[in-house]
């Protein structure tokens, strides 16, 4: 069996994915691994032999602490889809040739649904050829849609940013004595966890989002307009949070109603965008109200300055837990978070077979959603509040947060 470890990051980044990388690296060193390699741009980089020695890059004092609070993917990312089993055998042979060349015994991949698909295919291929390399997935996605885990590292920080931004937009939207609607577009294709985080803004000091539109509930433009109109009779200035993935009962994305060209990625996912602009235009045309469209876009996944310290810590710990599992002989699994209690918030870790996770999605339970009023019920708030708890204290340099940059 190989003596070295290799780790990669894949898919969309988060502001805590590097904390998981730090956890993997730290635990590997604790287990006595001499060389910990990093794949530049995920498995796609491995195929191009773009591999770096993290032992040299991260062993200096202070590097891991800085890495934990650096947003985006330190190693770079990819959206490379491995071929199905039995197809393009040469791709798998090239990957395992590279792993043998670096004497790899432990393979860790930090990512979401598509990244777990990679762990599934590589661990299955390893079993097929009799390889003893251990493949373990480390969860990551702001979308919070991985199954068999209470929540996904990255979600808590994104939710904290969204809740914070909604509070600030509510304050901004009320400064003029006129009717206005600010439509805020938030990421989320099939699962509305991110958009639901707008509900966290409501408190004694903030009205919060007046409406929250989620992809779990079919979108009816007429019902939407009627609800906006009714609410404006009570409160002239509204903030509406809408998922980029909201779709009609006919399964048509609302952003497509604006006649935007539709493109797809390597995994067949439609590129979304323009939902807020379409809805703000619809409101302006039908209700003659001032409107503004705001797209949070990539800000919601890289705002490390307002990250949740709970999220940062859990991300590090789940990376370390994945390494511990590999050294216990586990392979073809994903490390997952298991909530023990809400108050006080206690969360531990467990393993799940990758076949039960890859290519599946977890959506918000429908009984947590008030579809008629475009609101979230208390169970969601009890679920999400602990995940945004505690504040980070990043290192600053010349008045701005300092990050760890990989020299190419």
What is the predicted function of each stretch?
Residues 1-52:
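N-terminal phosphate-binding or glycine-rich loops at protein starts, especially the Walker A/P-loop
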Residues 4-14, 73-79, 105-111, 137, ...:
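Short glycine-rich or small-residue beta-strand-to-loop segments that form or flank ligand, phosphate
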Residues 4-7, 67-81, 140-150, 178-180, ...:
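Gly-rich Lys/Arg/Thr-decorated short loops/hinges at beta-loop-alpha junctions or inter-strand turns
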Residues 14-24, 46-47, 89-93, 113-121, ...:
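Short glycine/serine/threonine-rich phosphate/pyrophosphate-binding segments
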Residues 36, 98, 106-111, 117-129, ...:
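Accessory alpha-helical/coil subdomains and C-terminal extensions
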Residues 256-408:
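C-terminal non-catalytic interaction/assembly regions of soluble proteins
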